[in-house]
Amino acid sequence: MNPTPAHKSYDVVIIGGAMIGSSAAFWLTRNPAFQGRVLVVERDPKYEFASTSHTNSCIRQQFGSEVNVLISRFGAEFVHNFKAYMEDEAAPDILLHSFGYLYLADTPAFAEVLRDNAAMQNRLGAATRILTPDEIAARWPFYDLDGILCGSHNPVDEGYFDGGTIFDWFRRKAKARGVEYIHNTVTGITREGGRVTAVTLASGETIGAGTIVNASGPRANL
C-alpha cells in the first residue's frame, strides 16, 4: 500500500480503512449521484489491531429505538442479499447464523420495557416474541429463572455472520471504483470556521478534504 496520496485534495477523506471506513467508501462509490474523489488513510494495512479483525460479527434486532431496529433490519437484508449488492457473480453468499438474543426481566418495570420494545420491533418487521418463564424453561432448562417475570427473544436475523468476507469485498469494490487507499497516519485535522478542510499526514503532507469521515476506531487520538 503506497504511503503517498496521488492528489493534493479529495472530496472525501476517510480516516481508517477497516470495516466502517471501507463500508463508507463502498456506499459512496455505489451512489451514482456521487462522482467525487475518495482517499482512505489506514495506518495498519494488515488490520492486525483493527476491531474488525477481532469481532465475532454479531447482529440483533432487539433495540429500544426505531432507528436502530431499522438499521439492523437493513443489515440482515444486506447480508442475505450480499451477492446482489456486490453486483458480482464472484461474490460469495454470506450466511447469517441465527440463534437469537434472550433478554430477561426481573422487575415489572423492565418487563414492560421489553413488551413495549417487542411491539415496536414487531411493527418494524422483527420476529421478537415475549416468553413466559415456563416457555423459557422449556427451551433452555439450564437457566435459573427464580424471580424472572418474562423474557424477550428473537430467533430470526439475530446471530453472527462472516464479517471478514464482507469487509474484504467492501474494500475490493471500493478500490475497483477508484477509491485510493494509502498506508499512512492522520496526525491532525485543519479547521476553518465551523468545518474541517484538511488532514495532516505523519509523512508531512497536508491533504485538502471537502468532507472527513472519522472511522479511526477506539485507539485513535483524534
Segments predicted by a language model, with ranges:
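Active-site loop/turn elements of alpha/beta-hydrolase fold enzymes
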Residues: 43, 133, 186
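Gly/Ala-rich phosphate-binding loop of Rossmann-like dinucleotide-binding domains
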Residues: 25, 29-30, 173
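Glycine-rich FAD pyrophosphate-binding loop
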Residues: 29-52
